[in-house]
Amino acid sequence: LGDVYKRQTQQGMEGKRKLTAKDAITAGALGAVCIAIRFIFMLVGGISPYVWFATHFIDAILIGPVFMLLVAKIRKNGPFLITSLVTGLILVSATWMFPITGLVGGILCELCLKAGQFRKKGWLVLGFFCFNLGFIGDFLPLWLTKESYLEYAAQMMDPGYMTTMEGLLTWPVFGIIVLSILVGSILGALLGMKLMRKHFVKAGLAQ
């Protein structure tokens, strides 16, 4: 009898760890928000290279509450990897590197969340940083394939825009972008946690 109870308990726990159809729908809906925010800021980046390079900092802050809500509602591995990969595939027209960085960022995010049992703040922040860093695929061609990218972009972009951008394509600037993503991730995660306590729990959106 004890063995039967143990097996049933283990099966129940395994069932709870598996993504359900409801989990997938929730992840899809909230993932769509992440994709929409990223797409909008990619368009806004056309104003200036400075604005474009700052967009990952801004969208990390805005996505923070969405990320934390998704963690609180599901508390299972899978949704962020799915969201990262789908985002990369949808935005692959911008660069083929998007799905690759999205996949890596999504995997690292899931590992961090699991390590923190979906509750520990430090791991949540680190996981969110990895999630956001996965979106950096739209910038990588500028540094890794600089000459060919600039030659291609020059056919469509304003000469003044191109001159400014070319002057920014140094590795120290890339390091600043990564640092800005880290800072934005911390601020976004903290904002998400604050909203979680203040509004989401009261509204019954999270536990």
Predicted regions and their residues:
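Hydrophobic transmembrane alpha-helices
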Residues: 14-78
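Membrane-water interface at transmembrane helix exits
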Residues: 37-42, 46, 71, 75, ...
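Short, small-residue-biased leader/transition segments that mark boundaries at the very start
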Residues: 1-5
